[in-house]
Amino acid sequence: MAPRKDCVSSRSELVNGGILVKLEVLADADAVARRAAAMIATAARDAVADRGRFVLAVSGGHTPWLMLRALADLDVPWAQVHLVQVDERVAPPGHPDRNLTHLQESLLDRVPLPPEQIYPMPVEASDLDAAAARYAVTLRAIAGAPLVLDLVHLGLGPDGHTASLVPGDPALEVTAADVALAGPYQGRRRMTLTYPPLNRSRRILWVVTGGEKVDMLRRLLAGDESIPAGNVRHDHAEVLADRAAAAQLSAGQMRGA
């Protein structure tokens, strides 16, 4: 089979601590979105065949929506999929700042996912700390205790944040809870999964696009623990990046250890 024209290279990376990360660089954000969607669809079918369900955790930000639109067009066993949020902004229902608003438009309105298998973060609650604790209980009810998610999609911010684990926030230090409240960031408080459930998940899928991510992608692949994303330490992590984000990777990083 001839190689895909939109795939620039596919390599394996060894990051600090000997953790293997698979890196795939594609032509542009559209190609990354299609590839990510295909990987999620395959993971869903495999999980349902093996375990009878697939628990997918989706991050917010600006990068997921192309991926989720592509996913809506693929063969996915939606009746056995459970969808949870990695993070959410504290904002009113339907507000454009809410990740759920975009999740609804890009995916949920377009697929037959049972409503009772969609688990929005409860950011409208009056007591957000109690709501975060309840959300963690809900997740453990569908994905076990300790919580093990099947696939977690993560993005990467230009400041090195991932999920809503942002530089300097106390949520970075939370290890005794699976869900935490983060302080105001870009004008909004956030609810977020913490490092323990991210690192316990069966699989991590990083989706990184755009030239503003070049330095942070290099640092992520180098295992730089001074950035929040660098503390996601997972033996089954895959990074999909476009050419713009990968523009400053060294020959060694592209070649692998």
Language-model-derived ranges and their functions:
Residues 49-72:
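Glycine-rich N-terminal segment of FAD-binding domains in flavoprotein oxidoreductases
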Residues 198-257:
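C-terminal functional extensions of proteins
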